[in-house]
């Protein structure tokens, strides 16, 4: 059985981020451009954050009541556990302290999951001799480019050409 670490997710961390956004007005602007809903591993947290992000983009206030209403309007309130679940999440958080650090950690966990899934796919392709090697290399390059951009380290990495001295 895989642990949360092996799955590269942390449900408590996800809830800390969502809870902070529910209880503090200044929290969502700190993470809205750093996180995407799919970065949340737990489906309910994914749905809650998607609703909050949509509300923020539309200029709507975010709190326990408005998020509950937004989820209900989207037909997702029962799927996330109802009003009780939103209340439970918000009650677990005292403040938005360390929110940006939590967001960075969540982003890193998501990137690790993406890496694991992408590399599994590449390993599967390499085992299938009917797949053209050039196609595998192109897919490898796409995966690495996507991961570089998601990590925000693209500007700090050197190209393969520079590393092997062809440029």
Question: Which residues does each predicted region cover?
Answer:
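Phosphate-handling catalytic cores of nucleic-acid transaction enzymes
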Residues: 150-167
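Noncatalytic partner-interaction/assembly domains of nucleic-acid and motor enzyme complexes
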Residues: 1-111
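Peripheral, non-AAA+ core regions of ATP-driven protein-machinery
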Residues: 1-2, 131, 165
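Extended, charged alpha-helical coiled-coil/arm scaffolds that mediate oligomerization and mechanical coupling
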Residues: 83-149, 153
């Amino acid at each position: 059985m895989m642990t949360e670490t092996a799955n590269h997710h942390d449900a408590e961390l996800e809830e800390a981020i969502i809870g902070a956004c529910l209880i503090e007005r200044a929290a969502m602007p700190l993470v809205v451009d750093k996180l995407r809903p799919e970065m949340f591993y737990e489906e309910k947290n994914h749905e809650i954050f998607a609703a909050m992000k949509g509300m923020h983009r539309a200029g709507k206030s975010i709190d326990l009541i408005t998020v509950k209403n937004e989820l209900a309007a989207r037909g997702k309130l029962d799927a996330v556990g109802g009003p009780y679940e939103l209340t439970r999440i918000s009650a677990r958080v005292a403040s938005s302290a360390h929110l940006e650090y939590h967001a960075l950690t969540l982003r890193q966990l998501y990137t690790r999951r993406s890496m694991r899934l992408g590399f599994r796919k590449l390993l599967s392709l390499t085992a299938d001799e009917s797949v053209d090697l050039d196609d595998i290399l192109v897919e490898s390059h796409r995966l690495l480019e996507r991961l570089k951009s998601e990590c925000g380290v693209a500007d700090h990495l050197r190209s393969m050409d520079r590393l092997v001295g062809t440029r």
